[in-house]
Swiss-Prot record:
It comes from Aromatoleum aromaticum (strain DSM 19018 / LMG 30748 / EbN1). NCBIfam families: lexA. Coiled coil: none annotated. This is LexA repressor. SUPFAM superfamilies: LexA/Signal peptidase, Winged helix' DNA-binding domain. Residues 32-52 bind DNA.
C-alpha cells in the first residue's frame, strides 16, 4: 500500500519536476499526452499510473475529468503538521492543521512541510515552543543535523548522532537528557531534517 510517507522514486521525481517546470514556464500543468511524449511512454495509462502514485504520496492533487487536472500540492502552500497520532503517517490528512503560503524553494533542500514545535528541548539552538519548523522529508541524515524523529509513536526534534547501531538524539537545553536508541531493539524512523524556521509572531 502506498502512503504519503513513502519517498518518491527517481522517475516519479523527474515527472514531478516536469510538472513543476511546465507550470512555471507555461502557467498550466501538462496533459497526460505531454507527459507521455516527454518520457517516452507508449500509453497514457503509463502516465496515469505515475500520476496516481504521485497523488497517493501527497505530491499532487488530481482533478477528475480534466485534461490538465493536475495541481501541485506545494502550490497550495506548505502543510502545517500539529499533533501526530500513533501509527499514522506524518502527512496524514488529519494531522494537517493549516497550509501556509510559503515558497518551499526558499529552503535548501526544499521544505515539504512545517511542524509545530512543542516544548523547549531545543531552546539553545534557537528552536522554541510554538515555532514552525520547516522540514525536508528524507530518511537520509548526517551526524549533527537537526532531525524530526519518530520513536515509539512519539515525534521529537533533536540533533542526530550515531555510533554503529546506537543513535543519540541530543537536546539543546541542559534541562533535558539525550534520548539513546539501540536500533537493534527499538524502531526509529527519521521523518526529515530541519531546513529552516518560521517564528510564531504572536509572542
Amino acid at each position: 500500500m502506498i502512503s504519503r510517507a513513502d519517498p518518491l522514486t527517481a522517475r516519479q521525481a523527474e515527472i514531478l519536476d516536469f510538472i513543476r517546470h511546465t507550470v512555471e514556464s507555461e502557467g498550466r500543468p501538462p496533459t497526460r499526452a505531454e507527459i507521455c511524449t516527454a518520457f517516452g511512454f507508449r500509453s497514457p495509462n503509463a502516465a496515469e499510473t505515475h500520476l496516481r502514485t504521485l497523488a497517493a504520496k501527497g505530491a499532487i492533487v488530481l482533478e477528475e475529468g480534466r485534461a490538465r487536472g493536475i495541481r501541485l500540492v506545494e502550490a497550495l502552500g506548505l502543510p502545517l503538521v500539529g499533533h501526530v497520532a500513533a501509527g499514522r503517517p506524518m502527512l496524514a490528512v488529519e494531522h494537517i492543521e493549516a497550509r501556509y503560503q510559503i515558497d518551499s524553494a526558499l529552503f535548501s533542500p526544499r521544505a515539504d512541510y512545517l511542524l509545530r514545535v512543542r516544548g523547549m528541548s531545543m531552546r539553545d539552538a534557537g528552536i522554541i515552543d510554538s515555532d514552525l519548523l520547516a522540514v525536508h522529508r528524507t530518511p537520509q541524515v548526517r551526524a549533527g543535523q537537526v532531525v524530526v524523529a519518530r520513536l515509539e509513536d512519539e515525534v521529537t526534534v533533536k540533533t542526530f548522532t550515531r555510533e554503529g547501531p546506537i543513535v543519540r538524539l541530543l537536546p539543546a537545553n541542559p534541562d533535558f537528557e539525550p534520548i539513546v536508541v539501540d536500533t537493534r531493539h527499538q524502531a526509529l524512523d527519521i521523518e526529515g531534517i530541519a531546513v529552516g524556521l518560521v517564528r510564531n509572531g504572536s509572542r
